[in-house]
Amino acid sequence: MDEQSVRRTDEDVEAFIANSADPGALRTLDAAIRSAIPGISRTLWRGVFWGGTEQAIIGYGDITQPRPRGPAVEWFLIGLAQQQRHLSLNINAADEGRYLSQHYAERLGRVKVGAASIAFRSPDLLDLGVLDEMLHHAARVQPPDQPRG
């Protein structure tokens, strides 16, 4: 993750969701995130992500993310994106040395879990109760920064 390659924008998140390929799916997940962490900030991020792909991601909660090499970067606690064939959530929080996506992988439903990422075809395949539990956990172990003024 190069801090120059993916940046927050001032684009309207609601308009982005409304114009997406599957606004219903994004609205379901957006509501779940905002319900679990009331008052969390939402920002649309755009840029070239890992692997060289151009992406747009709704970022929830501002955090300062340490990196193994180089300075820490401004990032988001939760990321939500619609890919070509699936949806993805990035949970940028860890507990006991493991990303929370790995802690909850077995209980999340029909998903594919990477280090911090969770991929699935539809919110119907995701256990929203377990997602809610994981989001609460994320806010406890990696509290988002105060909203920007």
Model features per residue range: what roles?
Residues 1-149:
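Charge-dense, helix-prone N-terminal extensions
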